[in-house]
């Protein structure tokens, strides 16, 4: 056999062996076992499945940009995050918008709702097997067919007197009272921007209800804002106890995700970790 023939045979054998190893469980280099491409893909797939997508749902008088302090923390820690933008023109419409976002995700989801957004995730996540955890932040958590504002008279807050309806029935917070009632532990500058950019909510949303309550079947976490003047903290404790939620209390105004973003991110990540065990 000529030397060129020997070289060609040797190369063919090496290529065949290399392909066999790549397609198999592992390959070797200098006697050291290396993971195959297939094994790497399996490992990457397992990591992706194990880390839920975080869907953040804003409340009334706000929009998805309110999560701007929490999102970078979650993303830094490897989570995919989506902040829903709801119209606040009807509870049913906001539930449907949020449901579409949740349904579009691949793999497990953690749904997080602030304030009125708690009612939204309660309806939107119901019946979705991919939603593994719910996180309520100073939020409404109604029963099925229970109006969002069912307990506002039993557990009154100072916010009611500061609400100003427009001709179409949408509610705004009096800007002169916004920081004191909604964000008193946020800087004056940031609270001023929040007041100027507040997104009004249709008043009838608080008389509306959801058809199913997701927290009945999905593990839930609840953050009570101890210094909340928009939703009575006692109402928050009532909701948390009723749903059997894992409860954390933070010395905060109505917006702890703005004034205490690291704590809120940590809680969301705890829920996410527990959800995939």
Regions found by a protein language model. Name each.
Residues 49-91, 127-130:
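Conserved HGGG/HGGXW glycine-rich cap/lid loop of the alpha/beta-hydrolase fold
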Residues 112-117, 121:
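Gly/Ala-rich beta-loop-alpha elbow adjacent to hydrolase catalytic centers
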Residues 226-252, 258, 263, 271:
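Conserved loop-alpha-helix segment in the C-terminal half of the alpha/beta-hydrolase fold
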Residues 22-42:
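Signal peptide processing junction and immediate N-terminal pro/mature segment
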Residues 130-131, 135-175, 202-206, 239:
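Flexible "cap/lid" loop of the alpha/beta hydrolase fold
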Residues 134, 219-228:
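Conserved strand-to-loop "acid loop" that flanks and positions the catalytic carboxylate
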Residues 1-13, 17-24:
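Bacterial N-terminal signal peptides that target proteins for export
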Residues 193-214, 226:
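Active-site nucleophile elbow and catalytic-triad environment of alpha/beta-hydrolase enzymes
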């Amino acid at each position: 056999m000529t030397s060129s023939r020997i070289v060609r045979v040797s190369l063919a054998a090496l290529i065949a062996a290399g392909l066999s190893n790549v397609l198999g469980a592992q390959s070797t280099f200098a006697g050291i076992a290396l993971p195959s491409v297939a094994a790497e893909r399996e490992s990457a797939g397992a990591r992706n499945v194990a880390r839920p997508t975080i869907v953040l749902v804003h409340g009334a008088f706000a929009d998805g940009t309110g999560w701007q302090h929490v999102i970078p923390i979650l993303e830094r820690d490897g989570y995919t995050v989506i902040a829903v933008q709801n119209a606040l023109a009807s509870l049913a419409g906001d539930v449907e918008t949020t449901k579409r976002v949740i349904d579009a995700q691949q793999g497990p989801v953690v749904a997080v709702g602030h304030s009125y957004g708690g009612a939204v995730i309660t309806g939107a996540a119901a019946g979705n097997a991919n939603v593994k955890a719910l996180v309520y932040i100073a939020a409404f958590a109604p029963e099925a067919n229970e109006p969002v504002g069912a307990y506002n008279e039993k557990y009154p807050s100072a916010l009611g007197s500061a609400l100003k309806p427009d001709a179409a029935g949408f509610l705004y917070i009096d800007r002169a009272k916004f920081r004191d009632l909604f964000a008193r532990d946020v800087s004056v500058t940031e609270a001023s921007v929040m007041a100027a950019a507040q997104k009004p909510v249709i008043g009838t949303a608080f008389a509306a209800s959801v058809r199913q309550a997701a927290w009945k079947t999905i593990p839930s976490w609840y953050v009570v804002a101890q210094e909340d003047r928009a939703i009575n903290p006692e109402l928050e404790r009532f909701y948390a106890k009723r749903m059997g939620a894992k409860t954390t209390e933070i010395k905060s105004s109505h917006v702890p995700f703005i004034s205490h973003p690291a704590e809120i991110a940590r809680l969301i990540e705890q829920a996410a970790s527990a959800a995939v065990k």
